[in-house]
């Protein structure tokens, strides 16, 4: 396991209302549950995949 110190900060900008349950669960997995909330996570392939799944509901603040 690598110990990466790279972090990525994301913010929820849209509501998951009317979206599939899997997208709501992904937002919760990312630590987001209300519009305007921010979460700072370790930059890993798993997190990048989750971000890609709900990219239309969030905004990446810090990171690539």
From Swiss-Prot:
What is the official name of this protein in its record? Large ribosomal subunit protein uL30
Member of which family? Belongs to the universal ribosomal protein uL30 family.
Please name the gene that encodes this protein: rpmD
- The source organism is Beijerinckia indica subsp. indica (strain ATCC 9039 / DSM 1715 / NCIMB 8712)
Q: Does Zinc-finger appear among the keywords? A: no
GO MF, any single term: structural constituent of ribosome
Cellular component, GO annotation: cytosolic large ribosomal subunit
What CDD domains would the database entry show?
Ribosomal_L30 (cd01658)
Query: What keywords tag this UniProt record?
Result: Ribonucleoprotein, Ribosomal protein
Q: Does the keyword Transport apply?
A: no
- Subunit: Part of the 50S ribosomal subunit.
Annotated GO biological processes are: translation
């Amino acid at each position: 396991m690598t110990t990466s110190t790279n972090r990525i900060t994301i913010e929820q900008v849209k509501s998951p209302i009317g979206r599939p349950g899997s997208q709501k669960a992904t937002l919760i997995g990312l630590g987001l549950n209300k519009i305007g909330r921010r979460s700072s996570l370790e930059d890993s392939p798993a997190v990048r995949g989750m971000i890609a799944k709900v990219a239309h509901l969030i905004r990446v603040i810090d990171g690539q």
